[in-house]
Amino acid sequence: MMRKGEMLDKALLIATNAHHGQFDKGGNPYILHPLKVMHYLKSNDEELQCMALLHDVVEDTNTTYVDLREAGISERVINALRCLTKQRGQTLGEYKDAVFSNRDAMFVKMADLRHNSDIRRLKGVTDKDLERMAKYQRFYLEIRAKLNENLS
């Protein structure tokens, strides 16, 4: 059993190393994105925080689920990451279904979409950017509706 905060320390280290040298569309160090996603979650749940920090690691770096497991990342975190990671050849519909299948993944994806919809992150805003933002907002609302359905 890990002490409180230990998995979060590991997740931050893994994410920082994995995203080293990567930059977002606005030219900012990429690690700021997962940190912001974690902040948007406004949760004290350490595993949810880890999911936010690691949500792009498998998709965008050479890190594998095996690496994460060996580092002591919990199965709950890894299961959510499997739903949050776009697979090669996966359609948008299939990806959404994967996210909808995991409550944790839905919360992290909402925070991710919220940060991805922040136009202040871009250097200049094109029609293509606005189209992408609209797509993100639709997905955000779909997730919110699903979470509300599950409550009733």
Residue ranges, per PLM feature:
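Active-site helical microenvironments for divalent-metal-assisted chemistry
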Residues: 1-152
